[in-house]
Each structure stands twice: as C-alpha cells, then as structure tokens.
Amino acid sequence: MIRVFVGSHARWDEHEPVLGYSIRKHSTVPVDIVFMRPEYLGLDDAGCTGFSNLRYAVPELCGYRGSAIYLDCDMLLLADIAELAAYGKPGKWVVLDDGTDEVAVIDCSIRPPPLEELDQHKKHEIKTKLAEYMEPVIPAEWNVEDTFLPWAKLLHFTNLYFVEDCWRRGVPWYSNHPTESQEVLNRYILESYGQFGPDQEPS
C-alpha cells in the first residue's frame, strides 16, 4: 500500500476526485489517498495556496512510521505512482531534482515541527530545518508545469484558477484558449466524473 497525502483547500475541492482518479487509473499497487486541508488539521489558512505547510504534517499523520508521498492538489498523474515511490530512501525527504518539494517521497521517521507548531513557521524556515534530510533526485518528468510534454509523468497546473474556471465556464472550458495540457486535464475531468460535473445531471 502506497500512502499519498495531498495538500488541498476547499476552493479546489472539485479537483480532488480528478487527481485521485488519475492516481488510481495508473497505479499498479493499492493506494491510500488522504486530502489534507488547513481546517481538517486545525491550521491557519495561510500562504498563497492555503496549504503550503501541510506537507510537513505528513510524518506525524503517519505516526512517524513507514513512508509516504506528498503532492499538491493542482496535479494530474500520467504514470504509475509506484515509480515515484521507488525514489524513496531511508532517512531522506526525497524531493525534485531542482530542490522544490511540491512532489516528495518522505521517510516518515523524519520529524518536522509538530502540527501544533506549524502555523508558527514559514515554509522556507521549516525547509531549512530539514535541509540535512532533503535529497533532490526526483526528475523533472514528475513535475511538468503548465504545459504538456510527451515524457511527462505528472502535470502541475500552478495556476489553480484553471481548475476553478473549469466548473464556472463548463466543459470544455478551455475552448477559447486550448493547450494540450488543458485538454489532458479536461479528459481526466470527464473520465473522473463519469462525463458529468459534480452538480450536473445527464440530459
């Protein structure tokens, strides 16, 4: 069983099942997916996304045992998450090869500040405290931002309003400004909701 924790926010709840669907669609092993929101963990809604520090709650939520994957909610999996899990290393917080940690494979024996203290720290402060554990080895194919490339294994829509606009405008919401990455997202939305939005009924 691969444990996957996703930093999320109430504003983006329509995308949670889309990401979850994309993970399960490609996974060759059982997965346990937990969507974390600030209010679920008793934390402040802070930072540009509201969930920046939630990644550092993962070890505590796992009882400081085993390993887990962290993802942001504005992502879409195009490959087997077991491949991503294979980058894990004992005693390491494995992050992207450019040093960013929006995708991470975490040894949960590592102890960031506890939940009750997370609001007292900026994200960069916690990351600095964990620097000795950070291992930047996950290749760029696991974080292709705002575009589509043939070798992409994970798409990252850094403008979260793309997702919100999908439901505000209706599907296909990208019709006035199509890109290949948006078309891929739209296809997964249609698949994950059975071709109907969460508040729509078949005609």
State each model region's role:
Residues 12-13, 77:
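Alpha-helix N-cap/loop-to-helix initiation residues
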Residues 54-98, 104-112:
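GT-A fold catalytic core of metal-dependent nucleotide-sugar glycosyltransferases
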Residues 98-101, 148-150:
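Short gly/pro-enriched beta-turn/loop segments at secondary-structure junctions
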